[in-house]
Amino acid sequence: MFAQLNEPKLNVLLDLEPIRPEEAEATAALRLLGRMRRVYGVRFFDALTIDAWYVQGPFLKAVEKLGWGWKVVLKQERMEVFQEARQLSAGQKPVAEFDAARRQRHVPLWDVKDLTFTESYGHTVSVVHSHETWTETKVLGGKKTHQQNASDWRWMLCDQLKGYPPPMAYEAGHRRWGIEN
């Protein structure tokens, strides 16, 4: 397990933590985060971008207790917060719309606030939803073809990050993949 600092032009590995035999990944993650807080301090960064694997109330509360906000990619359509955000944003105008030049995508964003995540979490959250569209050009049999593509992303944010604009949540959510892509 690792922690990295992701910026548009720079990715820095901050720390590593092994997952012990018979140990839950979240336990190793909290050990890593506790050490990072001691080494770097609480103000080294404002928030963590967390994998969907950690969408659990107790884990997210532990991150907040360490002094950080969080955002997590929301993938599980069966979750009530996912369904509620989808229903509340349907038919609404986006709160922001732009062309993401680096990713070559057109991006409208919706921001749904004051949602209930889980009883065990106990605080409201917001969900930023993007519907990205782009044209992919391929050469097949010597001929250029253009294919329209679309993808939807949702990020859940803690209340501490409520004041950040939705485009920032979008950028931070996609920077999470800085090393892997």
Predicted regions: what they are:
Residues 180:
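Conserved, mostly hydrophobic/aromatic
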Residues 47, 176-177:
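Residue-level signal for helical boundary/lining positions with a hydrophobic bias
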